Amino acid sequence: MANSGLQLLGYFLALGGWVGIIASTALPQWKQSSYAGDAIITAVGLYEGLWMSCASQSTGQVQCKLYDSLLALDGHIQSARALMVVAVLLGFVAMVLSVVGMKCTRVGDSNPTAKSRVAISGGALFLLAGLCTLTAVSWYATLVTQEFFNPSTPVNARYEFGPALFVGWASAGLAMLGGSFLCCTCPEPERANSIPQPYRSGPSTAAREPVVKLPASVKGPLGV
């Protein structure tokens, strides 16, 4: 019962992390315009993501444009795209395996050991999905930080962390935490099929004593 509760907790944590990974992948606010220091606050806020760039007007109107060319993008954007897509796919497979392997489902009840191993496999894939997300988000954030503190970057062209990065960090943490809980599920040891036999006492000592037969030529002391 304890393992079943731990599986449910891990599954819902990892599922929430996977949904957050999808949201982080789709959001265009991976980096946004910086207004720190001497930067002039303009009426237009710029956002950039993995798939598009957006401009937000002071009136609330937002205009977004998809990137025109795939090959013309920077290497870190292409790498982040690949890692996030892989994380989404791994999370989907992990979700299916976890549902099959959890004790609260009816699939594979005839083999509890194999069922637990399937749940552990799902947890491992959730861990990989969270690791891919963490790598992509942290790498992107590192480049944004380097560009921000680069003296050659104009003040009005500097960017800061966007909300999508924080969503990605939180989602990666949830996916890895939930995957860890699923991996902590220990398979049940196989029980021996043999039925214990009742104890039977051995034959008595008297029955084990050998019977000595005298030859016919030997007679007793009375000559009988």
UniProtKB/Swiss-Prot annotation:
Presence of the UniProt keyword Membrane in the record = yes
Name of one Pfam family that matches: PMP22_Claudin
The main location class comes to other
- Impact noted for substituting N150 to A/D/Q/K: Abolishes interaction with Clostridium perfringens CPE
Q: Which residues lie on this side of the membrane: Cytoplasmic?
A: 1-7, 103-117, 182-224
Localization: Cell junction, Tight junction; Cell membrane
| Annotated transmembrane regions | 8-28, 82-102, 118-138, 161-181
Kindly list the GO CC terms recorded for this protein.
Answer: apical junction complex; basolateral plasma membrane; bicellular tight junction; cell junction; cytoplasm; mesaxon; nucleus; paranodal junction
Segments in the Extracellular topological domain = 29-81, 139-160
Task: State the reactions this protein catalyses.
Answer: Mg(2+)(in) = Mg(2+)(out); Ca(2+)(in) = Ca(2+)(out); Na(+)(in) = Na(+)(out); K(+)(in) = K(+)(out)
Outcome of gene disruption: Mice are born in normal Mendelian ratios. They develop peripheral neuropathy associated with defects in the electrical sealing by tight junctions in Schwann cells.
> Listed GO molecular functions?
cell-cell adhesion mediator activity; identical protein binding; paracellular tight junction channel activity; structural molecule activity
Membrane topology, from the record: Multi-pass membrane protein
Please provide the record's keywords in A-Z order: Cell junction, Cell membrane, Disulfide bond, Membrane, Sensory transduction, Tight junction, Transmembrane, Transmembrane helix, Vision
What does the annotation give as the result of altering I40 to A/S/L? Abolishes interaction with Clostridium perfringens CPE
The SS bond pairs are: C54-C64
Outcome following mutation: V155I:
No effect on interaction with Clostridium perfringens CPE
Per UniProt, subunit arrangement is:
Can form homo- and heteropolymeric tight junction strands. Interacts with other claudins including CLDN3, CLDN10, CLDN16 and CLDN18 with highest affinity for CLDN16. Interacts (via PDZ-binding motif TRV) with TJP1 (via PDZ domain). (Microbial infection) Interacts (via both extracellular domains) with Clostridium perfringens enterotoxin CPE; the interaction disrupts claudin assembly in tight junctions.
Q: What is this protein called?
A: Claudin-19
Q: Which organism is it from?
A: Mus musculus (Mouse)
Q: What is the lineage of its organism?
A: Eukaryota, Metazoa, Chordata, Craniata, Vertebrata
Q: Which gene encodes it?
A: Cldn19
